Amino acid sequence: MQQLGIHSVPQEIRQFIGVILLSGYNCQPEAKHYWSTQPDIGAQGAISCMSHNRFMEIKNYLHLADNQKLVEGDKMSKVTPLYKLLNSSFVKHGMFHEKLSVDESIVPYFGRHAAKMFLKCKPIQFGYKVWILCGNDGYPYHMIIYQRKEIHAPKVPLSTRVIRSMVDVIQETSNTTRHALYFDNFFNSYDLLVMLSELKMRAIGTIRPYRSKGADAVMLPDKDLMKQKRGAFEFCSDGNIPEKPAYVHI
């Protein structure tokens, strides 16, 4: 990498990335603390790689995309090459988990950006929302950075589009149909479960009453079910799912 007098080599870039990975689990209030001379604060892994000044120099000048070739309408185009590379690496050896989860993750960010979100009542309230497909032990297979409302978005609900994108990844990278998807009530709906059933994909998740196609109307209200003994449940089915009930109310 050479720009404005900044010169580096692949080995140094790998060390730079290593320091960033280190900061993911060894958290400090400021980057300079990793180079502290205090034995209970400084991180020897960072100190042995490069100086703090060199780390900040590379960080200031590092670019992941050519500014002359940015994709119009892609709010994350400056990091798109990186997360496409990550997605490719995640599935390099296939998809080896049977149970898969789709959920959101938040990357903390307090600066100004068109894709930055404010999420009230969340542990991390400001940052980028990322949809992630993971195995049951947390291993990530695919991620989609949410870029807020799309101008020409299709009429299909966002939650369904996210799940469908993840299913496409599963079908492209896995040779088995034994996978089961787990997700929360942001994604789940009767129509989504029908779509997944047609794609031979098993799924389970919580659901909001108004998305259950009337199932909530024939089942006990939450307040009444809570009065039952521990472990009490209800179920109803549309008759089209032979293995398990369509809805279970616990």
Where are each of the predicted segments found?
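Acidic, contiguous segments within the catalytic cores of piggyBac-derived transposases
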Residues: 1-250
